[in-house]
Amino acid sequence: MKPVFCGNFEYDAREGDLERLFRKYGKVERVDMKAGFAFVYMEDERDAEDAIRALDRFEFGRKGRRLRVEWTKSERGGDKRSGGGSRRSSSSMRPSKTLFVINFDADNTRTRDLEKHFEPYGKIVNVRIRRNFAFIQYEAQEDATRALDASNNSKLMDKVISVEYAVKDDDARGNGHSPERRRDRSPERRRRSPSPYKRERGSPDYGRGASPVAAYRKERTSPDYGRRRSPSPYKKSRRGSPEYGRDRRGNDSPRRRERVASPTKYSRSPNNKRERMSPNHSPFKKESPRNGVGEVESPIERRERSRSSPENGQVESPGSIGRRDSDGGYDGAESPMQKSRSPRSPPADE
């Protein structure tokens, strides 16, 4: 009977799951479970052909892996016509004190069941069950060899078990490895190893090479960028420079300068209050500094009055202020303008 190879399923897959999967296409005699793959023995080869055609590339398990199902290249142990196939493959490996046991009932088999099955061949030091396989460690290597020859392809709880040497002897910490795990590092295992892209992502060189987004963030948090965000000297001079305030006062209109510079703005006299409340109050008439008596003429009013004067803008000088005589003249000294206008010829005799 030629077994069917089934691979690429999950490591925690159970023998019963594979058996139920292949049972849809014919009677399954047994399933020889390994680490990550298995050999399925079917009673009729035509049923095995149907299973290969239907299940190859079939999604199986929780992760939906695609199974690899095909004929094996050589017959394995358990073949009734050549029952020593598995024994020959085990004897070709380096003998050790630890045996690798598979294809038992992982749901119901306990450590005590394995001890009972292997105790007749020598003193057992340690028994460990890992999911669907187990390790049996003997005290002497000769006892392990005797147990291998006697128990391979034997029945344990109605299951035909497969026994081989472990790749590495168990030590005090129990670090035995299955022989199929070492074979599993062949091309089938390498295909499942991390891709070069992932290795590149985890390498120190990739960590030093920043992405464009990281470079942008680095630029934003750099000290140079922080200094550019600090207040500029220009803004400081605008906020705290007294020259800037004087420039603003210089740019104001003459009316605003008159209002700001006039001491009557802060006057609290009743006359000032009444004048401000008066509807006839002009913003250009300011009180004189003589206790609010009289009005000070603004430059604009003076200019308007000079334009409307019959003397064409010729006004009296401050030095000519005095009492007017009865004929409209002045009692004081004449201004230079009046002297220029006075007739230079002597008065005519009457």
From Swiss-Prot:
Residues carrying Phosphoserine: 193, 195, 211, 241, 262, 278, 298, 308, 335, 340
Q: Which superkingdom, per the lineage?
A: Eukaryota
Mind telling me which CDD domains this protein's record contains?
A: RRM1_AtRSp31_like
Asked if the keyword Phosphoprotein belongs to this entry, the reply reads yes
Please give the GO cellular component terms listed in this UniProt entry.
nuclear dicing body; nuclear speck; spliceosomal complex
Q: Name one GO molecular function term.
A: RNA binding
InterPro entries (alphabetical): Nucleotide-bd_a/b_plait_sf, RBD_domain_sf, RRM_dom, SRSF
Where composition is biased (Basic and acidic residues), the residues are 73-82, 167-187, 216-227, 240-255, 272-289, 299-308
Keyword Cell inner membrane recorded: no
Share any extra remarks.
The splicing pattern of the pre-mRNA is regulated in a tissue-specific manner and by development, and changes in response to various types of abiotic stresses.
Q: How is this protein organized at the quaternary level?
A: Component of the spliceosome. Interacts with SNRNP35. Interacts with CYP59. Interacts with RCF3 and CPL1. Interacts with DRB1/HYL1 and SE.
Q: What does this gene product do?
A: Required for constitutive and alternative pre-mRNA splicing. Involved in primary miRNA processing and pri-miRNA biogenesis. Binds both intronless and intron-containing pri-miRNAs.
**This protein is called what?**
Serine/arginine-rich splicing factor RS40
